[in-house]
């Protein structure tokens, strides 16, 4: 599919996707863990450590892919992505304010746990054929949740369908949210 060219820098699709996932997780972490409130898109950049963190993520070698400066120029890739990050965290904060959450990104423990389980139990190796989520937000204790999922998957008869059902129930009860990082429209 060729390399996406972003702000005149060539970068592989996979590398860019990984950056987006880390950036989303980072913004969510600032919002959830560090209690940063972003009332509008610009606030993400006004918060120095969020801005610095995002710029560190969107860097390939010595190439700075995104620079986040104010005012945000509309219709630029930066504008599109900041808006996406903003809308995601806004929607989630609305649903989950005042709770105790842990945010896991693609490099995090829960992702490894669930991918490992699916691989071991159902012989599905690639994360994307069974597409869970790019980021998980877990309410309460991650280890208790993992234990619960693990014990419900013990025994022989379980199918991936049952795991999905369980994850869906957890989602309905707002104990676990999986976020997929497709761009969120304005």
Regions found by a protein language model. Name each.
Residues 2-186:
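Short, positively charged
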